[in-house]
Amino acid sequence: MGYSYSEKKRIRKDFGKRPQVLNVPYLLTIQLDSFDKFIQKDPEGQQGLEAAFRSVFPIVSNNGYTELQYVDYRLEEPEFDVRECQIRGSTYAAGLRVKLRLVSYDKESSSRAVKDIKENEVYMGEIPLMTDNGTFVINGTERVIVSQLHRSPGVFFDSDKGKTHSSGKVLYNARIIPYRGSWLDFEFDPKDNLFARIDRRRKLPATIILRALGYTTEEILNLFFDKITFEIAGDKLLMTLVPERLRGETASFDIEANGKVYVERGRRITARHIKALEKDNISQVVVPSEYILGKVASKDYVDLESGEIICPANGEISLETLAKLAQAGYTTIETLFTNDLDYGPYISETLRVDPTYDKTSALYEIYRMMRPGEPPTPESSEALFNNLFFSAERYDLSTVGRMKFNRSLAFPEGEGAGILSNEDIIAVMRKLIDIRNGRGEVDDIDHLGNRRIRSVGEMAENQFRIGLVRVERAVKERLSLGDLDAITPQDLINPKPISAAVKEFFGSSQLSQFMDQNNPLSEVTHKRRISALGPGGLTRERAGFEVRDVHNTHYGRLCPIETPEGPNIGLINSLSAFARTNDYGFLETPYRKVVDGQVTEEIEYLSVIDEANYIIAQANSNLDENNRFTDAFVTARGERGESGLYKPEDIHYMDVSTQQVVSVAAALIPFLEHDDANRALMGANMQRQAVPTLRADKPLVGTGMEKPIALDSGVAVVAKRGGTVQYVDASRIVIKVNEDETIAGEAGIDIYNLIKYTRSNQNTCINQIPCVNLGDPINRGEVLADGPSTDLGELALGQNIRVAFMPWNGYNFEDSMLVSERVVQQDRFTTIHIQELSCVARDTKLGAEEITADIPNVGESALSKLDESGIVYVGAEVKGGDILVGKVTPKGETQLTPEEKLLRAIFGEKASDVKDSSLRVPNGTSGTVIDVQVFTRDGVEKDKRALEIEEMQLREAKKDLTEELEILEAGLFARVRNLLISSGADAAQLDKVDRTKWLEQTIADEEKQNQLEQLAEQYEELRKEFEHKLEVKRKKIIKGDDLAPGVLKVVKVYLAVKRQIQPGDKMAGRHGNKGVISKINPVEDMPYDENGQPVEIVLNPLGVPSRMNIGQILETHLGLAAKGIGDQINAMLKQKQEVEKLRSYIQKAYDLLGNGSQKVDLSTFTDEEVLRLAGNLRKGLPVATPVFDGADEAEIKELLKLGGLPTSGQITLYDGRTGEKFERPVTVGYMYMLKLNHLVDDKMHARSTGSYSLVTQQPLGGKAQFGGQRFGEMEVWALEAYGAAYTLQEMLTVKSDDVNGRTKMYKNIVSGNQHMEPGTPESFNVIMKEIRSLGLNIELDEE
């Protein structure tokens, strides 16, 4: 493959053996596509806002003479862009305008003639918009809406697995779950009666539902049972014989016909007997009259003369009724066919416990169950039942639910509506009875075919619909009130309920989460997270093991590795690398189609439901050059997800990639296949906590997944169109777009403004650094600037560190690690953290708070860093306790006399009646002020500092826009110049004239003249647009801010804190090998090799075997080899060897074991490109070892050889303190280490005087409350064990909650008296009060 200019800068050697058939799809699709569907107009009205509007409108008044119809909607442009919203703390949203039509009909006219139509555009609140990176900015913070995995609507058959009843009998149940509406359950009880529940309420016999649907007893029995027909012929009783029904029964009489005995009495009827009966075509047999006794009649038998019912439907037949039937002239009797084996009498038994007898009584019974205490009437009970399952407004199965329903009950696809029909309910009961009879299987709830994904768009739509329904009620009321002549649609609609519903969802739903912005990976994985929690989902407490477990349908859809440790394990999952959702919301994964043992290039996405019928081979199956399987038997997954061996011709599909199974975070772990799953889980989770270091360093040993994640995360700047770099500085990159990618008549210039030193949600620093140079050719989609934790467009979460696995004086006992001072000196793990501190000036009852430098009782030195407005300077270095913003609050104890008030007003002396409430730097923090923002309420006068900031912003905006205009103009005039020169103008002459005059030239060629006129128009457009943009920007900057009620001013101060690595910081590798730094050791004391090169971190070898994460050792070896090759290249560069030698050596490194898919041909590179590549490889040759398809031991050894290193990967080391050789070679290599966001600075804390808990009077706990350390039970036991009685007494009294003792002791210390008098601890009083509250009097006997 050819490499572009940018790609040639650094090429990662790929160890993958299998070609990449399908690139990793865009990683944020699940968020962006879902929201697009929500916002885009859908002509069919199946989804999004359109569907919500169509489901609620038209709203018809109660009398039916007026209706409010929906026409269409549009979204306005948002007022502020994303960046401005973040700074101002506002929501990035667009106003929703809906066109509505109010139609009123003529009451007098019989043909519903239209009397009046009013059309109007109505404002319906704001809809938050998604940014390009799949996030929402709500109140200035970036949030992510996590997708939810919930139970798909449809019908589910399940059993209690014998857990409900003490006998251990398995009780089966069926549940119809709609998308919205009431749930309908059917269940068996231990006596095998069938019951129904609506919305999980009290259970009713299931036949009540059937009666309510209008079925009679006879019809119900016809629906569920086969019949046996008996004939009365004289004194004989003949039975119509269906031989198959007799199988397995014991004959209670001789079965004979035509004089031949087929089965003797007492014998078991077998298949042989049945064959004989069928062969001789026996259709009737004589049965003794006792045989019919106890059988159940299938219909009412009525004495036609007297009208008396001899035997009712579902009544048992006795000798008496038999005689009566014969007497009444019945010759045939139909009874129900049941047996104990596979035709149970469940419905018949249920009818016997059913208290109802017709439709009305059944409806009454349902009404009483749903609305206990209300008297039912025929109308209300009928309406209630219809509204439950048969009203499209109240009940909707949705297309997904209907599809699942039809598949489950083997109905034809695409039939049926969103509501239930009688046939649906009967089919569910039939299938449930079949399952009870031993035919059919129960469903597996954890199967991904029964769980679907609900993404942002769908959840937002549901919330929006809830808001609309609230509005609908109000509109209906309003329409019924009459006087419609004066009303417009505008008056009818109150947007409050809609915006409240939407706001609540985006602001405080359980699934709307504060984005994890530690690093690019944590952003991407947060957006790809799938949660089973949340509204309509599971709760942590109720979720059992089965739901949390890995299911075989997760393969290629949900990652089996990445899930949190702790209470949420298995409930929060991550999407696999290639997975996507289909239209129904089920997860799909791609496969290559296989035809007759030949693997094609065709790729198909299959959902679990589709996949069930196919045999699918693994991605690492061996193929020959014609893509045919080479093995006689191939390992593949067959039915039910079980793996087995299959012939190549039986295989239907093959996996796309070895990385298909895991999520992107797990796919970043090299040699994942050699790690234990539990440790891999920790590794995947800890990469998300890595803090971006000062200088990003790409991993030497990667997996090839680093590039797609960095590009898709949106932290790096990616070229929208190809071109050439025309200008580059720290904050802006300008690209002159290629001719073939420009739209006709535009300037062809793309400008990218970079983000500089801004704060992330996790207080880490976001900063973009250009990685292109002037004149570089750029292709579309290539990286122009690196963001945090990216290096040349590759994800770089940590640093490559030289590690040795050996014990070192106990400093790496139990997962601690010894770090060399050199790591600190080189700032390898130095990170920048940005804190935002804000000060709010409010309008209080006693007067307004004021931001000022005039603070009572504060010395000059404390104010030295403030300006005259009382706000700290940018660039000031501050430490804990320093004032950042001076603020005074009015105190209101003293009532002033009018004379005093006058004097105060004249002399302005007010120091006495205000208290200092300034914003100070929190304890333990120090840093540099990097930015100050002042927000002032509309109508409040801006202070000097605010005006300065405003002026600066205006200047910068004007400068930016002017530069932008200049760049665009230059591009435009270059085109004009070319046009004129091509038309015969003289270049030297042109350059003497003012550029604007060029546009006034005339050209003989008409086509070129048109082009020139077009360019002149564009020039005008540019100027106009510039003026417009500048005006808009000016208005935004000058405009007062929209602050919360009662707030006059907000000042935000941003502090940058530089944190070097220190003992107590937590670090980790990528294999779940985490530890804490125990000591920073001087370089000269670290172990070193023969060349005098010291190691940088010493790790404990005992941390490897028991944890079974061997991947870290392989990574260390491969890292050593990669670095060795880099050292060789570095040596060649230093010796200034000729380029050819360099080229052949690098070529050798890339070609080594070149049986993989990667082909690098350096002969096509120019000398300059080879040198640039070598320069980037001197720190080590980056390698990729894809998950499950990576480098093996032999390949690592070959690479070590090429780097001139021992193939064992072990090196002799010397002790840095004594210079002695260690007694055996040590594993040394390069491991990629991450610094995690668990820094000791944030955790270290010591309490001095602080606040106490109100009730117990004990110090609070935790750093945030400036709390103390709890002296708990175990600590008390320790003191008791030592008999340290006085120490214990102090601990329990004066040092804790003896209030009087505390104060006395303080006074004593002040006066130099070292005594203490312990009193009663407050918690003792508390327990006394608690016991009294139980009604037991307890008093302290003070004798």
UniProtKB/Swiss-Prot annotation:
EC number: 2.7.7.6
Reaction catalysis annotation: RNA(n) + a ribonucleoside 5'-triphosphate = RNA(n+1) + diphosphate
Enzyme class per UniProt: transferase
InterPro entries (alphabetical): DNA-dir_RNA_pol_bsu_ext_1_sf, DNA-dir_RNA_pol_bsu_external_1, DNA-dir_RNA_pol_su2, DNA-dir_RNAP_su2_dom, DNA-dir_RNAP_su2_hyb_sf, RNA_pol_bsu_bac, RNA_pol_bsu_CS, RNA_pol_bsu_protrusion
GO molecular function: DNA binding; DNA-directed RNA polymerase activity; ribonucleoside binding
Pfam family, one: RNA_pol_Rpb2_7
Gene Ontology terms describing biological process: DNA-templated transcription
GO cellular component, one term: DNA-directed RNA polymerase complex
Subunit organization: The RNAP catalytic core consists of 2 alpha, 1 beta, 1 beta' and 1 omega subunit. When a sigma factor is associated with the core the holoenzyme is formed, which can initiate transcription.
Biological role: DNA-dependent RNA polymerase catalyzes the transcription of DNA into RNA using the four ribonucleoside triphosphates as substrates.
HAMAP family attached to this UniProt entry: RNApol_bact_RpoB
Annotated PANTHER family: DNA-DIRECTED RNA POLYMERASE I SUBUNIT 2
Family under the similarity heading: Belongs to the RNA polymerase beta chain family.
Protein name in the entry: DNA-directed RNA polymerase subunit beta
Taxonomic source organism: Haemophilus influenzae (strain 86-028NP)
Gene: rpoB
